[in-house]
Amino acid sequence: MPITSKYTDEQVESILTEIGAVLDKHGATPELSLMIAGNIATNVLNQQVAASQRKLIAEKFAQALISSLQEPKTH
């Protein structure tokens, strides 16, 4: 997601690589991978974010996700 972060690219990529390996190990389909990612996001919001901030953060997360999608190339 294209944002300024306090985390290094190396930190993010290392965790992403490990999570990807677990999904590959279990033969997770794209649908299952997205379901798991959604459940992780929901759990983080519900368990680690104040109730008064959850909706705002979820909306910002959704906007960042949409903005990070690549547009199909046209000829």
UniProtKB/Swiss-Prot annotation:
Signal peptide feature range: none
A Pfam family assignment: DUF1414
Stored Gene3D superfamilies: YejL-like
Segments traversing the membrane: none
Similarity field: Belongs to the UPF0352 family.
Name the UniProt record assigns to this protein: UPF0352 protein VV1166
